[in-house]
Amino acid sequence: MLFFGFLLAFLSAVPGTEGEIIPRCELVKILREHGFEGFEGTTIADWICLVQHESDYNTEAYNNNGPSRDYGIFQINSKYWCNDGKTSGAVDGCHISCSELMTNDLEDDIKCAKKIARDAHGLTPWYGWKNHCEGRDLSSYVKGC
C-alpha cells in the first residue's frame, strides 16, 4: 500500500504531457486582445485554423521533425525561431528557449508567432495553415465567438 501511495505522489508531481487545451472561443478572444486581426494581412480565423491544425489548441504540443522540433500552441520550430539545445545550426530568431513555448502563458508564444508572421509577411511558414487554411472559407473557425 505504501508503494501505491508513493507512486500516486510521484505521478502527481510529474507535469502532464497534454498541456492546457485552450477553448477555441477563448483563444479567439486572446488573439483579438493581442492585435492579430489584420496583422500582416491575416484574420483571427486564419490564426485559429492554423492553431487547430498545428497543435489542436494544446499549449504543450510537441512534434519531432527529425533535425528540428516544433513547440507549443503555434508549433514554433527550433531550427529558426527558438533554442532547444538540440537543433544543429539553430538561428533562435525569437531569442527564446523552446521550453518557454510549452507553458500555459501565451505571451512569449504570441510575440514569437507575430515575429514569424511579420518576417514572412503572412502565415506561409506554417504547413498546417498552408495545407488546411490558405484560400479557404474560414468563417466557421470564429463563428459563435
Curated annotation (Swiss-Prot):
GO terms for cellular component: extracellular region. GO terms for biological process: defense response to bacterium; killing of cells of another organism. Its EC number is 3.2.1.17. It comes from the Eukaryota. Its main location: secreted. Keywords: Antimicrobial, Bacteriolytic enzyme, Disulfide bond, Glycosidase, Hydrolase, Secreted, Signal. GO terms for molecular function: lysozyme activity. Residues 1-19 form the signal peptide. Pfam families: Lys (PF00062). It is found in: Secreted. Disulfide bonds join C25-C145, C49-C133, C82-C98, C94-C112. InterPro entries: Glyco_hydro_22 (IPR001916), Glyco_hydro_22_CS (IPR019799), Glyco_hydro_22_lys (IPR000974), Lysozyme-like_dom_sf (IPR023346). It catalyses: Hydrolysis of (1->4)-beta-linkages between N-acetylmuramic acid and N-acetyl-D-glucosamine residues in a peptidoglycan and between N-acetyl-D-glucosamine residues in chitodextrins. The keyword Ion transport does not apply. The active site is at E54, D70. Residues 20-145 form the C-type lysozyme domain. Lysozyme C is capable of both hydrolysis and transglycosylation; it also shows a slight esterase activity. It acts rapidly on both peptide-substituted and unsubstituted peptidoglycan, and slowly on chitin oligosaccharides. Lysozymes have primarily a bacteriolytic function; those in tissues and body fluids are associated with the monocyte-macrophage system and enhance the activity of immunoagents. Monomer. Belongs to the glycosyl hydrolase 22 family. This is Lysozyme C. It comes from Opisthocomus hoazin (Hoatzin).
